[in-house]
Amino acid sequence: MIKNAFLFLALILTALWTQFSISAERQVECWVVGVSDGDTLTCLLPTKKQFKVRLQEIDAPEKGQPFGKKAKQYLSLLVFKQNVTLSVSGYDRYQRILATVYLQEQNINLEMVKNGMAWVYPQFAKNPLYFQAQDFAQQQKIG
């Protein structure tokens, strides 16, 4: 009986540790297994745990909106089936992980804005590089 209770407690603690381990780490490496739209992707950890990632500081058109399909395709071209590093800042209201996505040294969030596939999310953007990239894309009439 005590052995079963100990095993049950160990399972609960393991489940809780897995749930919170992503937010506890600032940097997470994962494999991109899906792209929902121009600012959301699905990652797979080496432990086979999947989770949604929302690219922070930017916003992209949704599937049914103009350029929505193009934004999704561009993000897919950049990161689908790639190992990426997430710089995690927390969770959004839909419990997706908020992160800046890096492919090697390339800031993917910034690339989306620079190439006119996303715009700056002014309520949440802190990095001035995003605003500069958006100005550049608008001046060049990209996207």
Enumerate the predicted regions with their spans.
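Small beta-barrel nucleic-acid-binding modules, primarily SNase/OB-fold domains
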Residues: 2-143
